[in-house]
C-alpha cells in the first residue's frame, strides 16, 4: 500500500526558508520519504519517527529527560495529516498520534539521522532495552 501527497510549494514554509516539495508514505516499507525544496531527500523509518516523537509524552515536561521508547522495531504508520502549513501529524499503529512534526524538526531528523539513530541504540543498550517487542 503506497500513498503519496504532492504538496503545494507555496503552502509549506518552514524556518530557514525551506519548503517541502513532496511527502510519500510507504506503508509496506514502513517509512516516509520527504523531499525539501533544496532537493534534499530524507527517508524516515517509522520506528525512528516514533522514537523521536516531539510529543510531550515522549519529550517529557520541562526538565524531565525524554522517555525511552523501545520495542517498536516493527511499528507502522497508519496515517499522515497536514497541520496548518508547517507540519504533519503522524498516527502510528501503536495508537500514538500526539506528536506534531514541524518541517524544521523533520529536516533536522533527516540531516542528523546517523547521529540520532546511534544515540538511540546506545541508550537502548545502556538501559538494557531492545528494539524488538
Where are these regions (language model features)?
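Motif-centric detector for short Cys/His coordination patterns
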Residues: 2-133
Amino acid at each position: 500500500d503506497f500513498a503519496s501527497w504532492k504538496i503545494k510549494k507555496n503552502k509549506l514554509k518552514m524556518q530557514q526558508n525551506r519548503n517541502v516539495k513532496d511527502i510519500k508514505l510507504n506503508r509496506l516499507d514502513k517509512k516516509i520519504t520527504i523531499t525539501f525544496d533544496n532537493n534534499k531527500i530524507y527517508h524516515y523509518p517509522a520506528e525512528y519517527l516514533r522514537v523521536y516523537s516531539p510529543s510531550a509524552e515522549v519529550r517529557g515536561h520541562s526538565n524531565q529527560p525524554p522517555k525511552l521508547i523501545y520495542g517498536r522495531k516493527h511499528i507502522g504508520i497508519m496515517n499522515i495529516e497536514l497541520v496548518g502549513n508547517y507540519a504533519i501529524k503522524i498516527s502510528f499503529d501503536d495508537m500514538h498520534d500526539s506528536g506534531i512534526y514541524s518541517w524544521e524538526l523533520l529536516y533536522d531528523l533527516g540531516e542528523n539521522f546517523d547521529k540520532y539513530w546511534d544515540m538511540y541504540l546506545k541508550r537502548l543498550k545502556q538501559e538494557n532495552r531492545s528494539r524488538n517487542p
